[in-house]
């Protein structure tokens, strides 16, 4: 059986730059690289090497995502990091939503990371009773629930994401991804740029507040007043691209 085709807007990006800095750009749960393309292209414009992978199960069909989980996504992040590391001295990791969670994972697990940029990251799992409810739905045969994507204030912009949320991967994200990290952020000392939308209907801003309050290193916390969850495609997208570029310059030799 042939694998489903990748959506045109979901293609990954790999760019060889002129500096010795790499930027690893990560999208979120049920989304695809299109949500982060503006950030990636801004980093290309600054001359940096860029890798923006398409996470397994994303950018094709929601049915393909059902069989993927945290280990698949971290594996792809590790591979993209390796491709970057082969041609740069240091790397800044930038992620939106679950991509922000993977950014934090990168800070724990990957070498030669100079700084982290988290945009509306998920940092703590849902309450145990919520996870138990999701598990019961899966046990009863429900694989896909209504979508959680598309939270953009700008009416002219539509996010490319699935119209359903696969529940097994969601449980994997919460249990294998967030639960082990949630009380460890104090161990991270890398510079962190944390960008948070005050109005976010997907990931509660309390996730960012928890990260800022418990983080072990320097935190620059910027609040967005005009954008919703997918802020990288929303009213504040140009500010996010500018702030990210300035942060990369500040924490690296470039």
Identify the residue ranges that each predicted region occupies:
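Short beta-strand/loop motif that positions the catalytic acidic residue
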Residues: 188, 194-196, 200
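Catalytic active-site module of serine/aspartate enzymes centered on a nucleophile-bearing elbow/loop
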Residues: 226-254
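Active-site nucleophile loop of the alpha/beta-hydrolase fold
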Residues: 117-127
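Short alpha-helix in the alpha/beta-hydrolase fold that links the catalytic acid
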Residues: 39, 190, 204-213
């Amino acid at each position: 059986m042939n694998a489903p085709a990748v959506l045109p807007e979901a293609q990954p990006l790999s760019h060889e730059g002129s500096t010795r800095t790499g930027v690893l750009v990560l999208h979120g749960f049920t989304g695809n690289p299109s949500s982060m393309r503006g950030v990636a292209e801004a980093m290309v414009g600054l001359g940096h090497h860029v890798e923006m992978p398409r996470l397994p199960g994303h950018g094709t069909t929601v049915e393909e995502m059902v069989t993927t989980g945290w280990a698949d996504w971290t594996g792809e992040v590790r591979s993209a990091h390796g491709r970057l590391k082969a041609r740069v001295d240091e790397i800044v990791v930038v992620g939106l939503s679950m991509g922000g969670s993977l950014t934090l994972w990168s800070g724990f697990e990957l070498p030669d990371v100079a700084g982290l940029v988290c945009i509306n990251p998920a940092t703590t799992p849902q309450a145990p009773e919520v996870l138990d409810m999701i598990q019961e739905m899966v046990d009863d045969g429900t694989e896909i629930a209504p979508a959680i994507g598309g939270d953009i204030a700008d009416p002219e912009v539509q996010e490319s994401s699935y119209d359903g949320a696969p529940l097994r991967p969601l449980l994997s994200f919460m249990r294998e991804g967030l639960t082990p990290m949630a009380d460890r952020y104090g161990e991270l000392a890398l510079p962190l740029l944390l960008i948070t939308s005050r109005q976010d209907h997907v990931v509660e801003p309390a996730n960012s507040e928890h990260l800022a309050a418990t983080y072990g290193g320097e935190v620059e916390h910027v609040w967005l007043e005009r954008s919703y969850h997918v802020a990288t495609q929303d009213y504040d997208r140009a500010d996010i691209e500018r702030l990210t570029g300035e942060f990369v310059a500040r924490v690296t030799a470039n």
